[in-house]
Amino acid sequence: MAGKSSGDRRKPLRGAKGGKNAAPAKSIRVGVIDYKDVATLRKFISERGKIRARRITGVSVQEQRLIARAVKNAREMALLPYAGSGR
Protein backbone atom coordinates (compact mmCIF):
# COMPACT_ATOMS: atom_id res chain seq x y z
CA MET A 1 0.00 0.00 0.00
CA ALA A 2 1.80 3.05 -1.26
CA GLY A 3 -0.74 5.78 -0.58
CA LYS A 4 -2.48 6.97 2.51
CA SER A 5 -5.92 5.70 3.31
CA SER A 6 -8.94 7.93 2.87
CA GLY A 7 -9.33 8.21 6.64
CA ASP A 8 -6.20 10.37 6.85
CA ARG A 9 -7.71 13.14 4.71
CA ARG A 10 -10.42 14.12 7.14
CA LYS A 11 -10.62 17.57 8.59
CA PRO A 12 -8.81 17.88 11.91
CA LEU A 13 -11.00 17.71 14.98
CA ARG A 14 -11.55 20.84 16.97
CA GLY A 15 -9.05 20.98 19.77
CA ALA A 16 -8.34 23.48 22.48
CA LYS A 17 -7.76 26.23 19.90
CA GLY A 18 -10.92 25.88 17.81
CA GLY A 19 -13.57 25.06 20.38
CA LYS A 20 -17.27 25.76 20.02
CA ASN A 21 -18.54 29.28 20.30
CA ALA A 22 -20.55 30.21 23.35
CA ALA A 23 -24.23 29.50 22.87
CA PRO A 24 -26.17 32.76 22.35
CA ALA A 25 -29.27 31.33 24.02
CA LYS A 26 -27.43 30.67 27.29
CA SER A 27 -27.44 34.39 28.07
CA ILE A 28 -31.23 34.56 27.70
CA ARG A 29 -33.92 32.37 29.19
CA VAL A 30 -36.09 30.14 27.04
CA GLY A 31 -39.32 31.98 27.81
CA VAL A 32 -37.83 35.34 26.83
CA ILE A 33 -37.43 34.56 23.11
CA ASP A 34 -39.91 36.87 21.39
CA TYR A 35 -40.49 37.70 17.73
CA LYS A 36 -40.30 41.43 18.48
CA ASP A 37 -36.74 41.13 19.86
CA VAL A 38 -34.97 41.39 16.51
CA ALA A 39 -31.50 41.91 17.98
CA THR A 40 -31.65 38.56 19.78
CA LEU A 41 -33.11 36.75 16.78
CA ARG A 42 -30.33 38.02 14.49
CA LYS A 43 -27.84 35.96 16.54
CA PHE A 44 -29.59 32.81 15.32
CA ILE A 45 -29.73 33.78 11.63
CA SER A 46 -26.89 33.39 9.11
CA GLU A 47 -25.71 36.10 6.73
CA ARG A 48 -27.91 34.55 4.04
CA GLY A 49 -30.99 34.78 6.25
CA LYS A 50 -31.24 31.10 7.19
CA ILE A 51 -31.94 29.89 10.72
CA ARG A 52 -28.73 28.43 12.15
CA ALA A 53 -28.65 24.76 13.16
CA ARG A 54 -28.74 23.58 16.77
CA ARG A 55 -25.24 22.15 16.55
CA ILE A 56 -23.91 25.59 15.65
CA THR A 57 -25.87 27.67 18.16
CA GLY A 58 -25.78 25.10 20.97
CA VAL A 59 -29.43 25.38 21.99
CA SER A 60 -31.78 22.61 23.08
CA VAL A 61 -34.58 21.15 20.96
CA GLN A 62 -37.24 23.16 22.75
CA GLU A 63 -35.24 26.38 22.43
CA GLN A 64 -34.66 25.73 18.72
CA ARG A 65 -38.40 25.33 18.16
CA LEU A 66 -39.11 28.59 19.98
CA ILE A 67 -36.41 30.38 18.02
CA ALA A 68 -37.67 29.01 14.69
CA ARG A 69 -41.25 30.04 15.46
CA ALA A 70 -40.13 33.52 16.58
CA VAL A 71 -38.01 34.02 13.45
CA LYS A 72 -40.89 32.93 11.21
CA ASN A 73 -43.28 35.30 13.00
CA ALA A 74 -40.78 38.16 12.73
CA ARG A 75 -40.40 37.49 9.00
CA GLU A 76 -44.18 37.50 8.57
CA MET A 77 -44.41 40.85 10.39
CA ALA A 78 -41.58 42.24 8.19
CA LEU A 79 -39.24 42.70 11.13
CA LEU A 80 -36.69 40.32 9.58
CA PRO A 81 -36.00 39.71 5.88
CA TYR A 82 -36.78 36.34 4.32
CA ALA A 83 -33.46 36.38 2.45
CA GLY A 84 -30.09 37.74 3.46
CA SER A 85 -28.58 40.97 2.27
CA GLY A 86 -27.34 39.28 -0.90
CA ARG A 87 -23.94 39.67 -2.49
From Swiss-Prot:
Residue ranges with Basic and acidic residues bias: 1-10
GO cellular component: cytosolic small ribosomal subunit
Entry coiled-coil feature ranges: none
Gene3D superfamilies in the record: Ribosomal protein S18
BP GO terms, sorted: translation
Keywords: Ribonucleoprotein, Ribosomal protein, RNA-binding, rRNA-binding
Molecular function terms from GO: small ribosomal subunit rRNA binding; structural constituent of ribosome
Region span, Disordered: 1-23
Family annotation (HAMAP family): Ribosomal_bS18
The protein's role, per its UniProt record: Binds as a heterodimer with protein bS6 to the central domain of the 16S rRNA, where it helps stabilize the platform of the 30S subunit.
Family: Belongs to the bacterial ribosomal protein bS18 family.
Oligomeric form and interacting partners: Part of the 30S ribosomal subunit. Forms a tight heterodimer with protein bS6.
Protein name as annotated: Small ribosomal subunit protein bS18
Source organism (scientific name): Clavibacter michiganensis subsp. michiganensis (strain NCPPB 382)
Primary gene name: rpsR
